Structures are given as structure tokens and as C-alpha cells.
């Protein structure tokens, strides 16, 4: 075992908030949130999401961040700090393994973004609007693999630089740019002819569009969007200084994440309405919305090529800030549990990313005939982590806080900076009752959907 490393730390509140917000504001906001909002009722989905974010999401962010800062350890060590029982180690390891499994396929999607951005920059954006472009690209094998490797190399280079010089510095640059771009593009989108109908659909709740699946889907999106139960917040909490407010930082991350999700919705949904008149089939496009529908929308705009460049720069920045957070969490686990140096840990994680990511990158091409329980590799890794492992990890965190540590200890950690825990009652109620119930609902619903018992 190598010599133990000195614990890294963020420079202060701004460093933590922008890094945590960067982890949260990723493809989940820019890509996933708009197509789910379009599919599950627009304004009513947004309303349900906001309610869940300020209750369920808030509670889990506070709990995970406090757990990390209390122990100064990544997930495995943080859970293990309260006992050596097998259940505690399992809870830590499932939180630690999730980012290791997510970041490879996440980087594949990041590679797709690089390809689209390069096409717009080179003046070939019109080709992206052609029928069959996306399917031909992801099934090409070599092109998809090269783009994935470029994105992976960029991510690893940032993580190699360290917490303060890599993760924090990049987040401090990319997040403000991301905000500005989102406002500019959303402003342009909502002024297109016919776009106001899309604004109304997205912002005005319509009870007629409400269903149980709206709630379940919003719960699942909140996990994906706020980086809950991925080990990231525990890891970032371990880098947080004692004089930084956990509650205040959590509220900043909540606001940042929700505003960017809303901006993403205003970028995409009004533009789709302007393009298609709110055609139901277009709104139901799902994951294809960004890579198939949006290029067609941009092609119909006067400044479509410029908007395409700005949009995919924004998406790339969002993807990078999240991928470095996922990778940092994985690297931190190897540093803590194996005593490895950052460079060795990052190198090993890089090898894992290439091996697992290549399965996803080639899964729609040369490896398309190989499936896992009927799913392509990327879809399987997404299902395994988001639908199965993350709800289990969230339940494990709730049980750790309520049955092992004690809610009072979390409260003490939250008030370390001398400020009162203003939403203590909300936290106590949610962590003891609704959070584990919500996580269990997501788990059961997702598995039932995968087995074909229900349709989401």
C-alpha cells in the first residue's frame, strides 16, 4: 500500500457550490429534463419536479454532504466509519461503484456531443438534420469510438490536475459561461414564431396532464439531475471546509440546478413548438429529441448554424462538468481505499472507462448483436445504475443517517459554521419517512417498467 495522501479541499463556498452545481447541471438537465417535461405534461411535470427538489432533493444533498464532511472520506470510508458491519460496507460500495459504471457510458454521449459540435463549427450543421444521420453515426463504430475517446481524455486530463486546480477551476470557468449561453439561447428560442405556445405548455401547469407516472418520472429525474446517490456529494462534502454552510450551499445548488433545467426547457420546448406546432409525436421523441429533432429545428431557423454552435458548446460544458465530478468520485475512492496516488487512481479509472465505455460506444454498431437482458450496453448500464443501484444507494444513506449515525449528528454537522439549521423539520421528516419511500417507489417502478409490467 502506498503512502496515504493529504486530503484535498475546495478553496471555499464558491468552489464547492460551482463544482457541486457542475456535477448536477449535466446531460440530465440539458438533454433528459426537456424531453421528459415534453413527454409528461410540461408545466405539471415542472411543478412536481420543483416540489420534489426542495424536499426530497434538498434532504438527500444535505445528508450526503454532511456525511462526507463528518468523515473526510469518500463513500466506502464514510459508511465504514460508523462500523464494520457488512451492511455498512455494502452501502458505501454501492455508492462508490455507481459513478464508476456511469461515467463510461456518459462519456459516450459526451462524445456524440463533440461530434455534433464539430459538425456545426465546420459548417456542416445542415447534415445533422438529415434523416438517418444520428443512427448512421452511432452505428458507425469507429467514429463513435474516437469521439468517446476524445471526451474521455479531456475528462481525465482535468481530474489529473486535482480538486482545486482541476475540478474546481474548470467548474468556475464553465458554469458562468453555461448560464450565459442558456439565457441567450432560451431568449432566442422563445421569440420564434409560434414559440409562446411552447412557453405556456412548459411553464403553466395543466392538471389534465397529470398522472402517477409524472410523479415517478420526476422522482427519477431528480436523482439523475441533482447527482443524488452517486457518491459525488459524499466525496465533495469530504473536500468542504468546516466554515462553509452546508444548508446554504445546498440551497445554492438547488437553485442553480432548477434554473438551468428551466432554461433548458425554454431552449428546447418552445423551439420544438415553433418547428412542429406542438405535434404530439415530436414532443414524445424522448432521448432522440436532442440528436434528431433539435438539429431539424435549428435548420429551420435563420441563425440556426450559430445557435447550433452555441447550444452544443453549452451541452458540452454541462457534460464535462458532470463527467469530471463522476470521475473525481471514483478516483477518490481508489485513493482512500487503496492508498493510491491521484495519478495512479486516475489512470486505472481511465482504463475502466475505456473498456466499459467502448462496449457502449460500439453497442449500436459492431456489437449491436450483443445485448444484456435485451438491452444494448449503454441502455443496460443506464438502467442498472439509475433505476436499480441509485435508489438502493439512497435507501442505504437514509438508513445510515436514521439508524446508525442519528439525525442529531447530521444536525450538529450542518450547524458547524454557527448558523441555525433553518429547514431542520423538513430534513427530519423527509429523511425518516418519505425519502426511503420515494426511493423504493422509483426502484419498484423502474424494474416493473423494464420487465414490461407497466409502461413509463
Task: Identify the function of each model-found stretch.
Residues 1-31, 60-65, 69-82, 86-93, ...:
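Membrane-interface "cap" regions at the ends of multi-pass membrane proteins
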Residues 12-52, 237, 248-251, 255-258, ...:
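Transmembrane helix-boundary motif of multi-pass solute transporters/channels
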Residues 9-20, 44-48, 86-100, 146-151, ...:
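Select transmembrane alpha-helical segments in multipass membrane proteins
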Residues 4-7, 35-40, 75-94, 107-164, ...:
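Inter-helical loop and helix-membrane interface segments of multi-pass membrane transporters/permeases
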Residues 2-3, 77, 110-139, 240-243, ...:
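Helix-loop-helix connectors at the membrane interface of multi-pass transporters/channels
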Residues 378-399, 422-456:
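A generic transmembrane alpha-helix motif of multi-pass inner-membrane proteins
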Residues 2-6, 10, 168, 172-320, ...:
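Membrane-embedded translocation segments of transport machinery
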Residues 37-63, 143, 389-393:
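Extracellular loop-to-transmembrane helix junctions
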